[in-house]
């Protein structure tokens, strides 16, 4: 029996069940044809039966043979292409360093396992080789696999060249965030979600006013978390959220990625917000990630917030924390049997992580506002940044805000 946290049953889940079934066979004196998976539908647990046929046993054989061969070698096995599932692994940082040192193609933004194989079939095995390619020739060759691969080829070459040089490259002229030129302030917005329950349990805002002389001063920012409590209901939660947004009705809402905009608009729609008000809310929302991708190429393996803000030397106060860990803390916090002191600590950690995500979003936005310095500055202490794009507009250096 396996407890599944995500929405879908993955190949890894099935292989693990197949392994357990094989280990149980001699103890039970017979084959184990099925596995059980427990998941959650709302507040109710549900069970799914999984057939463990011969096909999965063959795949398990192959996986075990590959593992045995890797353990016999003197050198470590090749780094996997997709390391997004490795964020909680203690080896994650070391693997990333090795991939960067070796020029692993999987470390070029836009290259997954399938596209990497296409490039290797063309004799392109490393970032250096990709950077040397003629964009038009590569587009023609990848075009045999479809228009999508042909169209992205020139950008892959440019991205590889930027990563090889270690310097950003501007793609589009003009300001990346013109909406902020006359804004009295901005709201930095980040949500934390539970995908199993399909709920956004925390809407976090960093309120950043502008000084009378037009400077942006992050040290004047204040954090406003709106926690979804099941006992209050979504309608009351929306009224609190709507009241906060209306208080700063002319301020742009900056977020990193499309998740926040989609979630907020869906919530407004479920609460019966008139179309005109929904359109006004949509017009206030600015996706910093989309603006960054339109205007710049960066020497980063990923354009996720952690990667980009880290390149700008922003540091989260809780090292190594990802959204998955914040979700785990949330689920533990919801356990009423947990000691009160432990629950307070969990909530504090969740809010600190969310606040730092908001602050990291501002670090990227501030870099864009400056027209972007041509390199990342020296490392900053945890929770802060020495990036001049973040602090240069204020007379004093902003240190880390206290945890909420």
Protein language model features and the residues they cover:
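Conserved DEDDh/DEDDy metal-dependent 3′-5′ exonuclease domain
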Residues: 1-70, 220-327
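Long, low-complexity intrinsically disordered regions
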Residues: 8-118, 122, 127, 139, ...
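Acidic, Mg2+-coordinating catalytic module of metal-dependent nucleases/exonucleases
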Residues: 40, 47-102, 308-380
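C-terminal extensions
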Residues: 92-213, 223-229, 234
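Short, intrinsically disordered C-terminal tails of secreted or membrane-associated proteins
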Residues: 400-403
């Amino acid at each position: 029996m396996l407890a599944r946290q995500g929405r879908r049953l993955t190949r890894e889940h099935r292989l693990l069940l197949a392994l357990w079934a094989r280990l149980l066979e001699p103890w039970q004196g017979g084959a184990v044809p099925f596995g059980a998976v427990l998941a959650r539908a709302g507040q109710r647990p549900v069970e799914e039966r999984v057939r463990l046929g011969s096909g999965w046993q063959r795949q398990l054989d192959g996986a075990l043979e590959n593992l045995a061969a890797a353990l016999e070698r003197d050198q470590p096995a090749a780094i996997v292409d997709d390391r997004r599932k490795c964020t909680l692994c203690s080896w994650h940082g070391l693997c990333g360093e090795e991939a960067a040192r070796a020029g692993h193609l999987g470390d070029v933004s836009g290259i997954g396992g399938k596209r990497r194989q296409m490039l290797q079939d063309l004799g392109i095995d490393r970032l250096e080789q990709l950077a040397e390619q003629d964009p038009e020739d590569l587009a023609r060759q990848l075009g045999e696999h479809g228009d999508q691969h042909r169209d992205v080829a020139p950008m892959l070459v440019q991205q590889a060249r930027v990563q090889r040089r270690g310097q950003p490259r501007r793609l589009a002229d003009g300001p990346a965030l013109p909406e902020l030129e006359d804004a009295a302030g901005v709201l930095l917005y980040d949500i934390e979600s539970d995908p199993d329950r399909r709920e956004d349990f925390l809407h976090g805002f960093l309120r950043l006013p502008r000084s009378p002389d037009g400077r942006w001063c992050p040290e004047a920012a204040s954090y406003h978390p709106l926690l979804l409590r099941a006992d209050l209901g979504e309608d009351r939660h929306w009224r609190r959220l709507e009241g906060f947004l209306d208080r700063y009705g002319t301020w742009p809402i900056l977020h990193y990625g499309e998740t926040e905009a989609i979630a907020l608009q869906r919530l407004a729609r479920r609460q019966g917000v008139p179309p005109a008000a929904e359109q006004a809310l949509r017009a206030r929302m600015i996706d910093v990630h989309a603006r960054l991708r339109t205007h710049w190429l960066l020497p980063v393996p990923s354009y996720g917030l952690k990667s980009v803000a880290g390149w700008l030397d922003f540091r989260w106060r809780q090292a190594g924390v990802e959204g998955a860990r914040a979700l785990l803390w949330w689920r533990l916090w919801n356990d009423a049997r947990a000691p009160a002191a432990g629950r307070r600590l969990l909530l504090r950690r969740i809010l600190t992580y969310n606040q730092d995500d908001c602050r990291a979003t501002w670090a990227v936005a501030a870099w864009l506002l400056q027209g972007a310095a041509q390199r990342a500055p020296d490392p900053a202490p945890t929770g802060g940044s020495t990036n001049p794009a973040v602090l240069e507009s204020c007379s004093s250096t902003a240190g880390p805000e206290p945890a909420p």
